[in-house]
C-alpha cells in the first residue's frame, strides 16, 4: 500500500488516523476481491514523516502505530488478507527503521496475520549486518514478504548487497512467500512521494 502525506496510523491527529484506516480498509477490500492475499508496505505511516519527539511522545506514537495495526489486522482477517509491515530508512520516517523494530511492532500487535516485510534497500541503509537482520526475523518466523532491490535502487546484482547469503537464509529457513523486485529508473521519483 502506498501511504503518502496525510496517511498515518501513528498520527497524533485522530482525523488523520481515521482517514488512513478508511483508506487501508479500502485497500484490504480491493486485495480481497483480487485474491491478492497480502497487503505490504509501511502500513503504520507514510513516507516523509521524520521528526524529533520527546521519549513520551515517541512512546505514544509507537502505541498509536501498534493499536492501528492491531485494528487493521482485525479488518484484514475479514478479507482473508495478511499484513506485511515494512521498515523504512531514517530519511523516510522516524517511526520504525530496522527489521528488529518492525519485528517488535509486529510482536506487540500480536496477530497471526501480521508479519515483517524485509526490504533490502532500506535494510542496506539501516542495518549493521543485513544477514543478521534478516535471520533475526526469519528465526522469529515473521518474514512474510521480501523486496529485492539493490542499494542504489537498481536490480539485484548491481550494488553491494550480499544476494547469495540473503537468498541462502531464505532457503535455509524455508521462506515460501513472494520475492518482489522493487527497482526504480535512474532519476525516477519514488511513487509514494508523489
Predicted regions and their residues:
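Short, functionally important structural connectors and interaction interfaces within domains
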Residues: 1-4, 80, 148
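Short clusters of hydrophobic/aromatic residues that line enzyme substrate/ligand-binding pockets
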Residues: 9-11, 155-156
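Active-site-proximal loop/turn and secondary-structure-junction residues that shape catalytic pockets
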Residues: 4-6, 43-47, 87-91, 120-122, ...
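Histidine-acidic metal/acid-base catalytic patches
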Residues: 35-37, 96-118, 123-194
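N-proximal short alpha-helices
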Residues: 4, 75-78, 136, 153
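Generic detector of short alpha-helix boundary/capping microenvironments
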Residues: 8, 90, 165-168
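Hydrophobic residues in well-ordered beta-strands that form the structural core
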Residues: 1-2, 40-41, 85, 118, ...
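Active-site acidic/histidine proton-transfer and metal-coordination neighborhood
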Residues: 10-115, 125
Amino acid at each position: 500500500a502506498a501511504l503518502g502525506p496525510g496517511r498515518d496510523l501513528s498520527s497524533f491527529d485522530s482525523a488523520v488516523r481515521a482517514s488512513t484506516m478508511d483508506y487501508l480498509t479500502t485497500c484490504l477490500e480491493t486485495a480481497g476481491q483480487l485474491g491478492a492475499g497480502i497487503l505490504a508496505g509501511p502500513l503504520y505511516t507514510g513516507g516523509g514523516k521524520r521528526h524529533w519527539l520527546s521519549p513520551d511522545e515517541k512512546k505514544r506514537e509507537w502505541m498509536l502505530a501498534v493499536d492501528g495495526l492491531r485494528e487493521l489486522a482485525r479488518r484484514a482477517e475479514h478479507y482473508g488478507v495478511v499484513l506485511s509491515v515494512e521498515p523504512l530508512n531514517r530519511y523516510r520516517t522516524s517511526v520504525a527503521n530496522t527489521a528488529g523494530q518492525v519485528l517488535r511492532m509486529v510482536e506487540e500487535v500480536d496477530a497471526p496475520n501480521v508479519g515483517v516485510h524485509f526490504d533490502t534497500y532500506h535494510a542496506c541503509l539501516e542495518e549493521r549486518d543485513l544477514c543478521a537482520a534478516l535471520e533475526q526475523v526469519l528465526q522469529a518466523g515473521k518474514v512474510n514478504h521480501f523486496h529485492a532491490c539493490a542499494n542504489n535502487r537498481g536490480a539485484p546484482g548491481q550494488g553491494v548487497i550480499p544476494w547469495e547469503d540473503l537468498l541462502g537464509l531464505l532457503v535455509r529457513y524455508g521462506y515460501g512467500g513472494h520475492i518482489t523486485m522493487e527497482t526504480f529508473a535512474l532519476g525516477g521519483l519514488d511513487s509514494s512521494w508523489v
